[in-house]
Amino acid sequence: MTARARAVLLRLILVIGASVGGFILLQEPARWLETHAALGLLQPFAGDRLTAVVGTSIVVVPIHGLPFTVDVTPSCSALASILTLACLATVLPRTTRARRLGALSAAIVTVALGNIVRIAASVGVGLVAGRSSLILFHDWVGSMFSFAYTLGGYVLMLYIVLPKVARNREAEVHAQLA
């Protein structure tokens, strides 16, 4: 095995290890933070119809129907997407460390805020329309929203890292095409 192949293999092992280890270590605090942030986002509108219970659960008292509990499970957390973006940041084109860190930070903020809004929207639908509507919204609209904010975070990360094309160069190309 060449030195280059060993370096690539070592990087791969470190990235996978960091992802798995990061998920195991951070999934509980991440879910707690997302649960309480979503609750804080909805509380001004919901009043006493929403209460936080132990850890990563929210008790919802819908306008019509029986109360139910919403659990933010590990698969509902943005942590997997955030760790994926962190892994992808290790293979971004060469740039300064500050630029790479800034790009990764912007992507992480995009994904984390997107997920908090998704959780709050799902709970809000449950508050207004009941448990089955929450499940339907979470499974269909929430999944599409998750895809959109994760992809958006990745594209933002690339936008920040990739070199910018000079505006005058763009104008020259457009003039040649016209």
For each predicted feature, which ranges?
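Hydrophobic N-terminal alpha-helices or hydrophobic patches in metabolic proteins across all domains
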Residues: M1-A178
